Amino acid sequence: MIAEANAPDRTAPVRRWATYREYLATADDTRIVEWADGEIIEYMPPLIEHQDLAGFLLQLIGAFVARFNLGKVMIAPTEVKLWPEGPSREPDIFFVPTADLSNFDPWRFNGAPDLVVEVVSPGSVREDRVRKFTEYELAGVREYWLVDPRPHQRTVECYRRDAAGVFAPVDVTEDGRLCSAVLIHAGAPFWLHVDWLWQEPLPKVEAALQQILDSGEQLS
């Protein structure tokens, strides 16, 4: 489990006790609202940097997944019911392989996605790094990425489910790549240069995807 203090911030989520039924009546498609441990967690609108990063990752991962027909990539606010009677989260990005697409119903995904990506906001630190970390691990998420763009952080962390069902940290390669064990085609993994996320402006999705595809061809 990752622990970090979360100082008061205007982006801190609003919390109130509620049943799951009350959560369903509150949630909509215009804001991120989650339900865990008997409380509704309503998040403030994210910062522009958060949305820029989430949008870049969604497009890049989505393009790779679509090119090889690997499954489905979703973005918040989409409910993920991690287990029956368990928490309902709305990850910034999540990936579901083709074999698990039947776990979608018209309103939500039921179960653990293979990949979850959360972009940390000042008000979501404890949720992303402690509570969700534990929930995703228990639910069986195979890979969890934490992208923290805060100026004093600027980190990307990857945790991968090991044989014991526990999240284990994954190091980036010597040249700064984060390689996925979940997003793979013909033995070649999806990867990204961590430095891409801190470039201004962010790289063009098409150019980044081509680098990924070119490296895969070299491995084949």
Regions found by a protein language model. Give the residues of each.
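Gly/Pro/Ser/Thr-rich low-complexity, intrinsically disordered segments predominantly at protein N-termini
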Residues: 1-220
